Amino acid sequence: MLDKTKYLSEHLASPNEAALSHSNKFDGLHLSPHFSLGELTKTSFKTEDNNEASVCRSSKFDGFRLSPHFTLGELTKTSYKTDDNNEPPLEAVENLIHLCDDWLEELRYLYNVLYVLRPSDDYFTSKEVEPLVINQGFRSYQVMLKMKEAGLNPSETSNHMRGCAVDIRCAGKEQAIRFMNILIDIADQKEQDFDELFLERRGTVYWLHFAARPKDNRRKIDFILK
């Protein structure tokens, strides 16, 4: 499994700095290498809005890291233009942080170590590491309506709308199956469950739909081939 203290240096000067500020649930959302949204919104005053910053369109959040290798911009990007700019509520951002930190980082690490890198390569410094490409993450209600207008059939109760799901791009069937195996192994080794793991295909294009909720996960596994 991935030793997260090893890549903590990408965001904090030392592991001890991680304990300096626990102001709110956004301590893990990095505005820059050494500053988090939690640090810059902390306050001793109790208010109904919890001094929470508004989350804007994805293009402005490419530098906001949900985890070392995934940004808020990546997980809110969409080709549909809407009035809300596919802006996630704060609860959805928290779910995205959990998804990236507990699942996607592990998947990225294990796939590269098992199938891409040589034994002598260092995952944290090698230029041969393959990125994990997200086709879609959070989906707002307005984006869902746009998808329906386009002739698609998105679910109104989809995990995407809570920030609990991602669609992961796959180079083909073999890579998709390897991703599935790794995610199942992560679940078994960590003794934590996911909600949905679907290998999907449309024509010759493959992707993996993966969802993990804060609770009430159903461990649904399926193949949806069209």
Label every model-predicted segment.
Residues 141-158:
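Charged, often glycine-rich, active-site loop that binds/positions anionic groups
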Residues 125-145:
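Acidic helix-start/capping segments at beta-turn-to-alpha-helix junctions
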Residues 116-119, 129-135, 198-199, 209-211:
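A structural signal for short, well-ordered beta-strand segments and their strand-loop junctions
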Residues 111, 136-138, 151, 170-172:
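Generic secondary-structure microfeatures
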